[in-house]
Structure formats: C-alpha cells, structure tokens
Amino acid sequence: MSDLENIDYYDYKALLKRARSQIPDYVFQKDRFELPEIEILIEGNRTIIRNFRELAKAVNRDEEFFAKYLLKETGSAGNLEGGRLILQRRISPELLKSRINDFLREYVICRECGKPDTKIIKEGRVHLLKCMACGAIRPIRMI
C-alpha cells in the first residue's frame, strides 16, 4: 500500500507513468514478425511445402491444425509426412502464400496490438484467440 499512498490521485501523468512501469518491456518492442521463407516444390500434380514443420513452429501452432486449414482453403487432399505438407494437386506458390497470410491474420496475429504472441484457448464450446502481449481475447471460428 505504501506505493499507492505516495501517488497524488489527481496527477494523471504520475499514474500513467506508474502503470507503464508495470508493463513488461517486450510489449513496447516494435520487432517485425517474420515467417521463414516458404519452400514450395511442385512435383507433377503434387505440391509440397518442404519446411512445413518449421513454419508451424514459427507461428506457434499445431501442425495438424495449420495443415487442416490449408487443405480446406485450397480445396485439396493431402497429408503430413516427415515435417512436410503434401498437397495432392498443383497449387501456385502465390495462392499458398496468400492462404498462409490469411491463416496468420485469422489465427495468429492479435488484432489489437499486431503481435504474434497468441494462443488458442477453449472456454466452454467457444474457441478464443488470447494475446499474451496485450491480453486481448477474441472468438475465432474453428476449422
């Protein structure tokens, strides 16, 4: 309580300074979130994302969840095999990159602060995206 006794309750700047001092430093950092370069290989009628496991780790999401999203959005059958995602049709690299960016916007990046430090939690029957940086919570649709 001694910290609160020293504050003039009408001094907005002092209160603001105190509140800001209690927020972790990493919240104020402006580091850009960069995804590793996507390694796409087209073999016949199959498209392979060679570094899929690395991509999933970079965005801190389960490989199965990420793969399910890409398979649904590209309208393709496919499977995970040894850290690679194999899609059973030819898909342009531009389309894949676009769908991966859509995934990041919907399931990774916080809409409030723009940071990728989020996790998916479940409360009852609702899935939520919770930001670990700013504390924002928003509902998301599951795949």
Swiss-Prot record:
* Biological function: eIF-2 functions in the early steps of protein synthesis by forming a ternary complex with GTP and initiator tRNA.
What protein does this entry describe? Translation initiation factor 2 subunit beta
Pfam families noted in UniProt = eIF-5_eIF-2B (PF01873)
GO molecular function annotation: translation initiation factor activity
Instruction: Report the sequence similarity comment from the record.
Output: Belongs to the eIF-2-beta/eIF-5 family.
Q: Which UniProt keywords apply?
A: Initiation factor, Protein biosynthesis
Q: How does the annotation summarize its subunit structure?
A: Heterotrimer composed of an alpha, a beta and a gamma chain.
Question: Which species is this UniProt entry from?
Answer: Methanocaldococcus jannaschii (strain ATCC 43067 / DSM 2661 / JAL-1 / JCM 10045 / NBRC 100440)
Q: Which InterPro entries does this one have?
A: IF2/IF5 (IPR045196), TIF2_bsu_arc (IPR004458), Transl_init_fac_IF2/IF5_dom (IPR002735), Transl_init_fac_IF2/IF5_N (IPR016189), Transl_init_fac_IF2/IF5_Zn-bd (IPR016190)
